Amino acid sequence: MTLSAVATRYANALADVVSPGSSPIRPEAALEELRAFEAALKSSVELHNALTSPSVPVGRKRAVVGRISDTLKISPIVRNFLFVLVDHRRIASLTEILHSFELIMDERLGFARAEISSARELTEPQRTALSAQLAQLTGKQIRMRFAVDEALIGGAVARIGSTVYDGSVRGQLQTLERRLSTER
Protein backbone atom coordinates (compact mmCIF):
# COMPACT_ATOMS: atom_id res chain seq x y z
CA MET A 1 0.00 0.00 0.00
CA THR A 2 1.42 3.42 -0.93
CA LEU A 3 2.07 6.05 1.69
CA SER A 4 -0.76 8.26 0.43
CA ALA A 5 -3.16 5.30 0.58
CA VAL A 6 -2.05 4.67 4.16
CA ALA A 7 -2.45 8.35 5.02
CA THR A 8 -5.92 8.37 3.50
CA ARG A 9 -6.91 5.27 5.46
CA TYR A 10 -5.85 6.82 8.79
CA ALA A 11 -7.40 10.17 7.85
CA ASN A 12 -10.70 8.46 7.00
CA ALA A 13 -10.67 6.65 10.33
CA LEU A 14 -10.14 9.93 12.20
CA ALA A 15 -12.82 11.64 10.10
CA ASP A 16 -15.27 8.86 11.00
CA VAL A 17 -14.52 9.34 14.70
CA VAL A 18 -14.83 13.16 14.73
CA SER A 19 -17.75 13.51 12.31
CA PRO A 20 -20.35 16.00 13.50
CA GLY A 21 -22.92 14.33 15.72
CA SER A 22 -20.77 11.31 16.53
CA SER A 23 -18.08 12.97 18.62
CA PRO A 24 -17.68 15.44 21.46
CA ILE A 25 -14.91 17.16 19.45
CA ARG A 26 -15.49 19.18 16.28
CA PRO A 27 -13.43 18.25 13.19
CA GLU A 28 -11.91 21.75 13.13
CA ALA A 29 -10.78 21.38 16.75
CA ALA A 30 -9.25 17.97 16.03
CA LEU A 31 -7.41 19.46 13.07
CA GLU A 32 -6.04 22.32 15.18
CA GLU A 33 -4.88 19.91 17.89
CA LEU A 34 -3.12 17.74 15.32
CA ARG A 35 -1.49 20.82 13.79
CA ALA A 36 -0.23 21.85 17.22
CA PHE A 37 1.23 18.39 17.77
CA GLU A 38 2.78 18.44 14.29
CA ALA A 39 4.36 21.84 15.02
CA ALA A 40 5.86 20.46 18.24
CA LEU A 41 7.16 17.44 16.35
CA LYS A 42 8.73 19.63 13.65
CA SER A 43 10.23 22.06 16.14
CA SER A 44 12.51 19.48 17.74
CA VAL A 45 14.78 17.16 15.78
CA GLU A 46 15.35 15.11 18.94
CA LEU A 47 11.62 14.67 19.50
CA HIS A 48 11.07 13.72 15.86
CA ASN A 49 13.91 11.20 15.98
CA ALA A 50 12.66 9.70 19.26
CA LEU A 51 9.12 9.21 17.96
CA THR A 52 10.14 7.83 14.57
CA SER A 53 13.09 5.67 15.58
CA PRO A 54 12.43 1.92 15.57
CA SER A 55 14.96 1.50 18.39
CA VAL A 56 12.85 3.49 20.88
CA PRO A 57 10.28 1.23 22.61
CA VAL A 58 6.63 1.95 21.84
CA GLY A 59 5.91 2.43 25.56
CA ARG A 60 8.38 5.31 25.73
CA LYS A 61 6.95 6.86 22.59
CA ARG A 62 3.45 6.65 24.07
CA ALA A 63 4.69 8.31 27.26
CA VAL A 64 6.24 11.16 25.25
CA VAL A 65 3.07 11.59 23.18
CA GLY A 66 1.03 11.58 26.40
CA ARG A 67 3.18 14.31 27.98
CA ILE A 68 3.07 16.46 24.86
CA SER A 69 -0.70 15.94 24.65
CA ASP A 70 -1.07 17.09 28.26
CA THR A 71 1.07 20.16 27.61
CA LEU A 72 -0.88 21.07 24.47
CA LYS A 73 -4.24 20.20 26.11
CA ILE A 74 -5.08 17.72 23.36
CA SER A 75 -8.46 15.99 23.64
CA PRO A 76 -8.62 12.27 24.52
CA ILE A 77 -9.87 11.35 21.04
CA VAL A 78 -6.94 13.02 19.27
CA ARG A 79 -4.51 11.68 21.88
CA ASN A 80 -5.76 8.14 21.23
CA PHE A 81 -5.40 8.71 17.50
CA LEU A 82 -1.78 9.77 18.06
CA PHE A 83 -1.26 6.62 20.15
CA VAL A 84 -2.56 4.53 17.23
CA LEU A 85 -0.07 6.26 14.92
CA VAL A 86 2.74 5.51 17.36
CA ASP A 87 1.64 1.89 17.84
CA HIS A 88 1.54 1.32 14.06
CA ARG A 89 4.74 3.26 13.38
CA ARG A 90 2.94 5.91 11.35
CA ILE A 91 3.76 9.04 13.34
CA ALA A 92 6.27 10.06 10.64
CA SER A 93 3.32 10.25 8.22
CA LEU A 94 1.44 12.78 10.36
CA THR A 95 1.83 15.65 7.87
CA GLU A 96 0.42 13.59 5.01
CA ILE A 97 -2.36 12.23 7.23
CA LEU A 98 -3.26 15.80 8.24
CA HIS A 99 -3.43 16.86 4.60
CA SER A 100 -5.68 13.90 3.74
CA PHE A 101 -7.85 14.59 6.80
CA GLU A 102 -8.39 18.20 5.69
CA LEU A 103 -9.43 17.11 2.20
CA ILE A 104 -11.76 14.40 3.52
CA MET A 105 -13.46 16.71 6.02
CA ASP A 106 -13.86 19.43 3.38
CA GLU A 107 -15.57 16.91 1.11
CA ARG A 108 -17.83 15.61 3.89
CA LEU A 109 -18.78 19.10 5.08
CA GLY A 110 -19.43 20.45 1.58
CA PHE A 111 -16.38 22.66 1.17
CA ALA A 112 -14.06 23.11 -1.79
CA ARG A 113 -10.57 24.58 -1.62
CA ALA A 114 -9.70 27.18 -4.23
CA GLU A 115 -6.24 28.48 -5.09
CA ILE A 116 -6.73 31.98 -6.49
CA SER A 117 -3.95 33.72 -8.43
CA SER A 118 -4.53 37.31 -9.49
CA ALA A 119 -2.45 39.97 -11.20
CA ARG A 120 -2.76 42.17 -8.11
CA GLU A 121 -4.04 41.89 -4.56
CA LEU A 122 -7.82 41.53 -4.52
CA THR A 123 -9.94 43.79 -2.33
CA GLU A 124 -12.31 42.28 0.22
CA PRO A 125 -15.41 42.98 -1.93
CA GLN A 126 -13.68 41.31 -4.91
CA ARG A 127 -12.82 38.29 -2.77
CA THR A 128 -16.40 38.04 -1.54
CA ALA A 129 -17.80 38.28 -5.07
CA LEU A 130 -15.32 35.68 -6.34
CA SER A 131 -16.20 33.34 -3.49
CA ALA A 132 -19.92 33.69 -4.30
CA GLN A 133 -19.32 32.99 -8.01
CA LEU A 134 -17.20 29.92 -7.29
CA ALA A 135 -19.75 28.66 -4.76
CA GLN A 136 -22.46 28.98 -7.40
CA LEU A 137 -20.31 27.12 -9.97
CA THR A 138 -19.37 24.26 -7.64
CA GLY A 139 -22.40 24.06 -5.38
CA LYS A 140 -20.04 24.06 -2.38
CA GLN A 141 -18.80 26.55 0.16
CA ILE A 142 -15.38 27.84 -0.88
CA ARG A 143 -12.22 28.08 1.20
CA MET A 144 -9.86 30.32 -0.71
CA ARG A 145 -6.12 30.86 -0.62
CA PHE A 146 -4.79 33.86 -2.52
CA ALA A 147 -1.55 34.58 -4.34
CA VAL A 148 -0.39 37.41 -6.59
CA ASP A 149 1.03 36.48 -10.01
CA GLU A 150 1.89 39.58 -12.03
CA ALA A 151 2.46 37.42 -15.13
CA LEU A 152 -1.32 37.13 -15.45
CA ILE A 153 -1.38 40.77 -16.66
CA GLY A 154 -4.93 41.19 -15.37
CA GLY A 155 -7.83 39.13 -14.03
CA ALA A 156 -7.53 35.95 -12.00
CA VAL A 157 -7.14 32.18 -12.22
CA ALA A 158 -8.98 29.87 -9.81
CA ARG A 159 -7.95 26.24 -9.26
CA ILE A 160 -10.37 23.93 -7.48
CA GLY A 161 -9.00 20.42 -7.41
CA SER A 162 -8.06 19.60 -10.99
CA THR A 163 -10.41 22.20 -12.50
CA VAL A 164 -9.00 25.55 -13.61
CA TYR A 165 -11.17 28.62 -14.21
CA ASP A 166 -9.00 31.06 -16.17
CA GLY A 167 -10.26 34.62 -16.22
CA SER A 168 -6.84 36.17 -16.76
CA VAL A 169 -5.77 38.45 -19.60
CA ARG A 170 -2.83 36.11 -20.22
CA GLY A 171 -5.22 33.17 -20.61
CA GLN A 172 -7.43 35.12 -23.01
CA LEU A 173 -4.39 36.10 -25.09
CA GLN A 174 -3.23 32.47 -25.22
CA THR A 175 -6.70 31.34 -26.34
CA LEU A 176 -6.76 34.02 -29.03
CA GLU A 177 -3.28 32.98 -30.19
CA ARG A 178 -4.37 29.32 -30.46
CA ARG A 179 -7.48 30.25 -32.45
CA LEU A 180 -5.51 32.41 -34.85
CA SER A 181 -2.84 29.76 -35.38
CA THR A 182 -5.43 27.04 -36.18
CA GLU A 183 -7.29 29.23 -38.68
CA ARG A 184 -4.25 29.62 -40.92
Swiss-Prot record:
NCBIfam families hit by this protein: ATP_synt_delta
**What binding partners and quaternary form does the record give?**
F-type ATPases have 2 components, F(1) - the catalytic core - and F(0) - the membrane proton channel. F(1) has five subunits: alpha(3), beta(3), gamma(1), delta(1), epsilon(1). F(0) has three main subunits: a(1), b(2) and c(10-14). The alpha and beta chains form an alternating ring which encloses part of the gamma chain. F(1) is attached to F(0) by a central stalk formed by the gamma and epsilon chains, while a peripheral stalk is formed by the delta and b chains.
Similarity comment = Belongs to the ATPase delta chain family.
Give the Gene Ontology MF terms in alphabetical order: proton-transporting ATP synthase activity, rotational mechanism
Q: GO CC annotation: what is one? A: plasma membrane
Q: Name one Pfam family in it.
A: OSCP
Subcellular localization(s) per the UniProt record: Cell inner membrane
Q: Give yes or no: UniProt keyword Transmembrane helix.
A: no
- Sorted UniProt keywords: ATP synthesis, Cell inner membrane, Cell membrane, CF(1), Hydrogen ion transport, Ion transport, Membrane, Transport
In the record, what lineage is assigned to the organism producing the protein? Bacteria, Pseudomonadati, Acidobacteriota, Terriglobia, Bryobacterales
Instruction: Please report the record's description of how this protein sits within the membrane.
Output: Peripheral membrane protein
Ligase keyword on record: no
Its annotated function is as follows: F(1)F(0) ATP synthase produces ATP from ADP in the presence of a proton or sodium gradient. F-type ATPases consist of two structural domains, F(1) containing the extramembraneous catalytic core and F(0) containing the membrane proton channel, linked together by a central stalk and a peripheral stalk. During catalysis, ATP synthesis in the catalytic domain of F(1) is coupled via a rotary mechanism of the central stalk subunits to proton translocation.
This chain's protein is named: ATP synthase subunit delta
